[in-house]
């Protein structure tokens, strides 16, 4: 028997069907590649694309939109441009570039997109962040007041760095810039500080040697290495520092402390210049584009010490700049000097004369780190900078003067010994309490009767002696962070006690 449907039933069924009817339409804006040269493609037809948006090519390659022109857009290819041809389709993603962040990245070597390149398998990270983020404003920040110990005597005593500071490391090639960075990373062991080392445009063998050195000292466990090598495209080299600081911001925003090294921003500027010239942007001084200052300022402003309300986390930045024949007045060096809170200037002549780290104390400065220096170091190194400056002056004068009075001679002798005190081998950072002890010995004349050539031996033997017999003095300096009258007396007694047994 056939079922009879009433007219109102039919209309209600049709109405229900109409209400539940959905058209699943996937609307994509698709453009076409009209030109490609040196990793930069010109794409036609993406009328609504955003600056900084990620686009996808037919062959799966990804690109980043940098130029928005009237008819076309300039897209840099992220990775290799092999396989991209004219006429190929390009699809919008609607998303800006992101990179993975989090604890899962520690101990790994990644490219600027967050993909692992160390052969240790995939990285488990739950969070992604935009590579370009706005720097914290004035009210979100707090003044730099906590010390960041580098373990390098000359820096901690004369050019102190605080958490949240930007301190430039500048010098010619082969003057020990990367060594300073590695030393500082090694010295953060046990300090609950995450280190990020960004290698830009370096040889893969150099980066491999750095990774090996960090592994040997057990420092890779709390370090992330972001590598855009010399063989990688200019686009990846350009993105590397921004990816690195995005990873650091995750720790800063969670109330933790991070240190980031950009090695080096000279190559970063060169990569940006290469991209800009191919994108036909007008060149300026030294053929760099007009916004090369903003390139570095927006990067370095993201290093900050956050206020207590925002968790009091910090990012300390150490940008590295390579100069040509000591020319600090070139375009990129002067730009970065003006952005940072001080600079550590390394000199070839000092390096070649055996003074290592080859820090020029006269030209190096820390504009905000003094507020972060612990009192014990301030007490022993108060006049050290002036003493070394007058020593250099006297040294130049003594070359021409045959007979010197006793005071001048004693100043020269003291200066020579202080220069020896500040010398240090690579990859052996010195804890702050031991720095205080040896600088105290030099500043108070305990090394005046020790031959300058024996100062290093004196220090090497003094430290085990202090640990064995006067550990309480080292503990007092470490815990109180100052030299009390009692500690001062104990320290003098310890050094005098050691000198009786020292055979220089």
Curated annotation (Swiss-Prot):
Membrane topology per record: Peripheral membrane protein
Disulphide bridges: none
GO terms of molecular function: ADP binding; ATP binding; proton-transporting ATP synthase activity, rotational mechanism
EC number from the UniProt entry: 7.1.2.2
InterPro entries reported for this sequence: ATP_synth_asu-like_sf (IPR023366), ATP_synth_asu_C (IPR000793), ATP_synth_asu_C_sf (IPR038376), ATP_synth_F1_a_nt-bd_dom (IPR033732), ATP_synth_F1_asu (IPR005294), ATPase_a/bsu_AS (IPR020003), ATPase_F1/V1/A1_a/bsu_N (IPR004100), ATPase_F1/V1/A1_a/bsu_N_sf (IPR036121)
Highest taxon of the lineage: Bacteria
Site feature: Required for activity: 364
HAMAP family from the UniProt entry: ATP_synth_alpha_bact
Subunit note: F-type ATPases have 2 components, CF(1) - the catalytic core - and CF(0) - the membrane proton channel. CF(1) has five subunits: alpha(3), beta(3), gamma(1), delta(1), epsilon(1). CF(0) has three main subunits: a(1), b(2) and c(9-12). The alpha and beta chains form an alternating ring which encloses part of the gamma chain. CF(1) is attached to CF(0) by a central stalk formed by the gamma and epsilon chains, while a peripheral stalk is formed by the delta and b chains.
Name used for this protein in its record: ATP synthase subunit alpha
Organism: Sulfurovum sp. (strain NBC37-1)
């Amino acid at each position: 028997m056939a079922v009879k449907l009433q007219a109102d039933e039919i209309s209600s069924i049709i109405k229900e069907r109409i209400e539940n009817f959905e058209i699943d339409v996937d609307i994509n804006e698709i453009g076409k590649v009209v030109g490609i040269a040196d990793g930069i493609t010109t794409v036609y037809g993406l009328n609504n694309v955003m600056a900084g948006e990620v686009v996808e090519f037919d062959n799966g390659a990804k690109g980043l939109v940098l130029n928005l022109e009237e008819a076309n857009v300039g897209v840099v290819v992220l990775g290799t441009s092999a396989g991209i041809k004219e006429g190929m389709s390009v699809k919008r993603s609607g998303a800006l570039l992101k990179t993975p962040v989090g604890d899962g990245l520690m101990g790994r070597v990644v490219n600027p997109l967050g993909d692992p390149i160390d052969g240790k398998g995939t990285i488990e990270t739950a969070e992604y962040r935009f590579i370009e983020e706005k720097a914290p404003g004035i009210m979100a920040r707090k003044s730099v007041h906590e010390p960041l110990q580098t373990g390098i005597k000359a820096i901690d005593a004369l050019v102190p760095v605080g958490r949240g500071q930007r301190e430039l490391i500048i010098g010619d090639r082969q003057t020990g810039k990367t060594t300073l960075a590695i030393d500082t990373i090694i010295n953060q062991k046990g300090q609950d500080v995450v280190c990020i080392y960004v290698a830009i445009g370096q040889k893969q063998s150099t980066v491999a040697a750095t990774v090996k050195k960090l592994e040997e000292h057990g420092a890779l466990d709390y370090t992330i290495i972001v590598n855009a090598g010399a063989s990688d495209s200019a686009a990846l080299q350009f993105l590397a520092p921004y990816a690195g600081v995005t990873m650091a911001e995750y720790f800063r925003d969670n109330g933790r402390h991070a240190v980031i090294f950009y090695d080096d921003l000279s190559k970063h500027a060169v990569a940006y210049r290469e991209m800009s010239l191919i994108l036909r942007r007008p060149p300026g001084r030294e053929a760099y584009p007009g916004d090369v200052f903003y390139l570095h300022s927006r990067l370095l402003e993201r290093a900050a010490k956050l206020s207590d309300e925002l968790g009091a986390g910090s990012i300390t930045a150490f940008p590295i700049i390579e100069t040509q024949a000591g020319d600090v007045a070139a375009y990129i060096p002067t730009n970065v000097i003006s952005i940072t809170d001080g600079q550590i200037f390394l000199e070839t002549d000092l390096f070649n004369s055996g003074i290592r780290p080859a820090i020029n104390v006269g030209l190096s400065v820390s504009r905000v780190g003094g507020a972060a220096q612990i009192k014990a170091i301030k007490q022993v190194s108060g006049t050290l900078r002036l003493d070394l400056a007058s020593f250099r002056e006297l040294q130049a004068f003594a070359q021409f003067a045959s007979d010197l009075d006793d005071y001048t001679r004693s100043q020269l002798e003291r200066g020579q010994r202080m220069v020896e005190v500040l010398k240090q081998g690579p990859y052996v950072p010195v804890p702050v309490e031991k720095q205080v002890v040896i600088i105290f010995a030099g500043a108070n004349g305990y090394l005046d009767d020790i031959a300058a050539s024996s100062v290093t031996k004196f220090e090497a033997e003094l430290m085990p002696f202090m640990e064995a017999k006067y550990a309480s003095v080292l503990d007092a300096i470490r815990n109180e962070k100052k030299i009390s009258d009692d500690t001062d007396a104990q320290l003098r007694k310890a050094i005098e006690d050691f000198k009786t047994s020292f055979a220089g």
